[in-house]
């Protein structure tokens, strides 16, 4: 099986063309391939499949390193767009793909950055899903014998955003896994730790569902900005500084889609016998 190794700001992926190859990935195989000692090593596996609808270009599937399938990955979407162009699967600059929960438009710019229409953030608890009586801008939760104030949103996957004074000293390794599996998130959640530098600039660390802390999380950056705007903390255009680098997020507010712009890097191509 042929594959490519790619990354978006250090969030790394194994990308596989299932348009011209017959492939099947069991959870056991994914976990073995994800192992950085005996496999390829990656945060997520991205699979390019033929479209299910003639109006679409491809179907986009995402698997975490633990073998679970998820419905959204913003950094992966940028790598997906670069991959299908690099491999000659399309020469379009605007690529329309389906995911497990909807559609996305991926636009490759002249300088090879990728702009992704991530859709409109959804703050309804049932959409996240999150156990709450009604939607709130800020929720009070108990975790590890402490009170946590957070915002909750779906970007096609569940996100919880916690504002902190300093991301460098935030208890990501302790609070991340506790909040990820909190009983109020029936499908678990991605946990963002956001430091507001000014209205146009935040710093962010993300503990990803099924992957742990990664160097960058595209949908996490989108979620942090969406929550920050909803809470009146941020402007419509925000620079997000992650451990792996920078993303630019733009959202005009309710009724509008959110856009993410950032790089996607091809590392190498490989072949593996399964």
UniProtKB/Swiss-Prot annotation:
EC number, UniProt record: 5.1.1.7
Site label Important for dimerization, positions: 268
Residues annotated as binding substrate: 11, 44, 64, 74-75, 157, 190, 208-209, 218-219
Domain of life of the source: Bacteria
Pfam families named in the record: DAP_epimerase
UniProt-annotated site: Could be important to modulate the pK values of the two catalytic cysteine residues, residues: 159, 208
Cell compartments where the protein resides: Cytoplasm
InterPro entries (alphabetical): DAP_epimerase_AS, DAP_epimerase_DapF
Catalysed reaction, written as an equation: (2S,6S)-2,6-diaminopimelate = meso-2,6-diaminopimelate
Residues of the active site: 73 (proton donor), 217 (proton acceptor)
Cystine bridges: none
Pathway: Amino-acid biosynthesis; L-lysine biosynthesis via DAP pathway; DL-2,6-diaminopimelate from LL-2,6-diaminopimelate: step 1/1
Any single GO BP term: lysine biosynthetic process via diaminopimelate
Physiological role: Catalyzes the stereoinversion of LL-2,6-diaminopimelate (L,L-DAP) to meso-diaminopimelate (meso-DAP), a precursor of L-lysine and an essential component of the bacterial peptidoglycan.
Family: Belongs to the diaminopimelate epimerase family.
Protein name (Swiss-Prot/TrEMBL): Diaminopimelate epimerase
Lineage: Bacteria, Pseudomonadati, Pseudomonadota, Gammaproteobacteria, Enterobacterales
């Amino acid at each position: 099986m042929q594959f490519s190794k790619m990354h978006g700001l250090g969030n790394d992926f194994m990308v596989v063309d299932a348009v011209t190859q017959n492939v099947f990935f069991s959870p056991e195989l994914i976990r073995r391939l994800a192992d950085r000692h005996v496999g390829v090593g990656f945060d997520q596996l991205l699979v390019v499949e033929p479209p299910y609808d003639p109006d679409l270009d491809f179907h986009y599937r995402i698997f975490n390193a633990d073998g679970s399938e998820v419905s959204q990955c913003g950094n992966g979407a940028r790598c997906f767009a670069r991959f299908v162009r690099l491999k000659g699967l399309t020469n379009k600059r605007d690529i329309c793909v389906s995911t497990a929960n909807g559609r996305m438009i991926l636009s490759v710019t002249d300088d090879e950055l990728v702009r992704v229409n991530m859709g409109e953030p959804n703050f309804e608890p049932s959409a996240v899903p999150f156990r709450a009586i009604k939607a709130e801008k800020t929720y009070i939760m108990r975790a590890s014998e402490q009170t946590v104030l957070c915002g909750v949103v779906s970007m096609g996957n569940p996100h919880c955003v916690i504002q902190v004074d300093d991301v460098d000293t935030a208890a990501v390794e302790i609070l991340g896994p506790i909040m990820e599996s909190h009983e109020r998130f029936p499908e678990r959640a991605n946990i963002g730790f956001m430091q507001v530098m000014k209205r146009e600039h935040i710093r962010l660390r993300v503990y990803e569902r099924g992957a742990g802390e990664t160097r960058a999380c595209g949908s996490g950056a989108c979620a942090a900005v969406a929550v920050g705007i909803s809470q009146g903390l941020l402007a419509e255009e925000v620079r997000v500084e992650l451990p792996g680098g920078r993303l630019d997020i733009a959202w005009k507010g309710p009724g509008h889609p959110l856009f993410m712009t950032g790089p996607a890097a091809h590392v190498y191509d490989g072949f593996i016998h399964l």
